[in-house]
Amino acid sequence: MPIQQKRSLTSIVSYPERGDGGNNKYRGNCSPELIKDLISHFSLKEINDYMCGSGTTCDAANDMGIGSNVYDLHSGFDLLHHDIPERSGFTFWHPPYFDIIQYSDVMYSAAEIQQKYGYDPRQSDLSRISTWEEFVKAMNYCMMKQFCALEKGGRMAVLVGDIKKKASSTV
């Protein structure tokens, strides 16, 4: 495992250098350095991510020499409707920011997912929910579902940011 300089984690983080991992062309993905810092800070042996996007969590875990369980709508896992397949000691969650970036049919083909996995990802894509109230309801459901899948004493880190529209902050 590579030697990693520990950075202190706060509620606000900034990584001027993104680092390697995931696909920086996949809109909305985070720096793998954040995930590596979480792995280091909590001395993790495994990390789970149920909305893994471009695979940044998996890449960071591989770089740090630990296991990962990563899933996404585009790879056959629907957090709204599927059971979480394992108990988690640590879950990382970076959900979509309402309607800022749409994923199904923009970042990946919904038709291909439907053909491969038998469901239409647009029906469960949080980034396609039309009202703020329904989005928050779905987010709360997904949050509690992941929380309930934690092992006793397990932890969950959630990466969120501001939603800004017309120069005013919504959240």
Where are these regions (language model features)?
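Class I S-adenosyl-L-methionine-dependent methyltransferase catalytic core
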Residues: M1-V171
